[in-house]
Each structure stands twice: as structure tokens, then as C-alpha cells.
Amino acid sequence: MTDQSVTDRKRSAILDAARAIFSRKGYSDTAVDDVAEEARVAKGTLYLYFKSKEELYLAALENDLREMSAAARREMERCHGLREKFRAFLRVRVDFARAREDFLRIYLAQYGTIFLKTPLSRDLVHMFKQNMRYVAKVIEEASRNGEIGPVPAGAAAGALFDLSRGLIERRLLGWKEFQVADEIEFSIDVLFSGIQAYGKSSAKRGKTTTKREGHGAEVA
């Protein structure tokens, strides 16, 4: 076993322990000592990998989100048609939230205090942007294939991520009065209605512009 593989295994064990402790005790009540004990490593060893509790939590979060993002891409690539790809995207994320409910609830509670104030957040932001660019390309392809009308792909991708985040947040917060029986299908219907409406209005704007240009040419 190489030194690097030992290092990777130890780091992975620490992150697994951190996820378990944070989920069980919450963020405020978790101490680095608790994680070290759970991972069966010395506190000093843990600090070789992570400099603070905030960095430890965000590293565990980033690890999970990368895993979720990879799973979402795999499922989307297996699907045919934009609607099916959207369904796969949302299903993976909702299932992930269900499996990591206690851990992700910390993210909601601590967003302003840890996510925005640590250098590690730059890696997370970069990952979020990469994911959105991937979805935007999927939407652009659907538009080129004539499956949907012309639409600003980046904004549409952002809307899908917003819907996903809303689904997860309502689940974590337990806001059942704002949920429907099949939230994924409802969310897809809402998004597709908006995309179709935008495509129709865009087509109308294009026709109006063409008429104006033609009229101007006749006058000239």
C-alpha cells in the first residue's frame, strides 16, 4: 500500500466520522475531539488534514456533493429527452437529501456563518458552476434538436437548480403544507411550462422584428 493510498484512506475515514458526528450531534455541539475519537485518530493527526471544524464540515459536504453530482450526470446521460433528464436530475438530488437529511440540515442552518467565510467555499462554488454549465449544455442540445424552443440555457439551468434546492429545503424544514404528492413531476411541469412559454414569446418577438425590418425596407 502506497503512502498516498494510506493518506487517502485516513482522510476518507475522518470525513466519514465527521459526517456521522455532525449528523448525530449537530454543528454547534460537535468538537474536533469528537470526530477524532470517532475516526480513531489522534487530534493532532486530524489537524494535519483539516485546520478547523468549519473546514472539516465543508470538506465532508463537498465530498458528498461531488458524489451526488457524478450520480446525477450518470443518470441524465442514460436518459433520452430533456424531460427525462430533468426527472433523473431531480430524483438523484431528492434521494440524496433523504439519505443525508441530518447532515444537510446543518448546511441550511450554518450557511451564512461557514459557507461564505472560508476559502474552501471557492471549490464548492466552482463545482456548482461546473454542474450548471453541464445542465445548460443539455438544454442547449435539446433546443438545437427542436425538442424545445429557443431559451437562455444558463437561466433555464439556474431555474432547475433553484427548483431542486427548493424541493430539498422544504423537505429538510418539514414544510409539508407547501408540498405536493409528486413534487418532482410538479416541478418539471412548472419548469417546462415556463420554457415553452418563453419559446413562444421569443418566436413572436422574432416575427415582430422581421415585420418591422421588412416595413422599414419598403419605406426606404
Sequence positions of predicted segments:
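Amphipathic alpha-helical packing segments from all-alpha helical-bundle domains
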Residues: 66-69, 118-145, 154-158, 182
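Short hydrophobic/aromatic patch on the recognition helix
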Residues: 39-50
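Short coil/turn segments at alpha/beta junctions that flank glycine-rich nucleotide-binding fingerprints
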Residues: 24-28, 79, 100, 145-146
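Basic, helix-initiating cap at the start of DNA-binding domains
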Residues: 1-25, 29-41, 55
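Alpha-helical DNA-contacting segments of helix-turn-helix folds
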Residues: 58-64
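Hydrophobic/aromatic-rich alpha-helical bundle segments in the mid-to-C-terminal region
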Residues: 143-189, 198-207, 211-220
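Hydrophobic alpha-helical connector segments
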Residues: 59, 73-102, 157-160, 200, ...
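Amphipathic alpha-helical segments used for helix-helix packing
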Residues: 97-119, 169-170
